[in-house]
Amino acid sequence: NKKTTIVSFGHRNPQGLYYSQKFDFILSTEHGPKGGDEINMNIQPFLEIKNFGWPISSYGEHYSKHYTEEILKEAPLNKSHKKFGFEEPIKFFNPSIGISQVVSINEAETEFFIGAMGNEIKEQDLGIHYIKLNNERNKIINHSYIPLNERVRDMIISKDKKTVVVFLETTSSLAFLRKLDN
């Protein structure tokens, strides 16, 4: 007998998922509609079911302006989550970066690489985003970008957290990012 538990809903198109059993949180990435890619944090996911807002709230837009009032009523894409009772993303990208995988790169589980598989290096969507969270893991305190000029489809990290294997879609190749000892 396997027991399953729903811990959240209101996700549009999840791409990356990281669960920390040690610190009890889930960090997820998801594609928004035309813009509005999100990084979502679910702290203590087993205490209460959280709603991240889709399709009521999104920082993206509908792909077409030719929607009926009925569709817009069901999916208004309000530009606030909190105002409508939903969890706000800890970060959203507008324009979209084509967000993909998320991996933790340190033992404290406060630093992460997030892949981007968009189309424009100038929009910071062909490479890897680095984020650092505060100790409570509810806010990004540092964000930078590593341009690769490649669509980053997936990443995995070694057990010692010193090597990240990056799956590059543009050239169908692998890259290795290694942490240098100081």
Language-model features: locations:
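Repeated scaffold domains used in trafficking and secretory/extracellular systems
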Residues: 151-155
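Short loop/turn motifs that cap or connect beta-strands within the blades
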Residues: 145-148
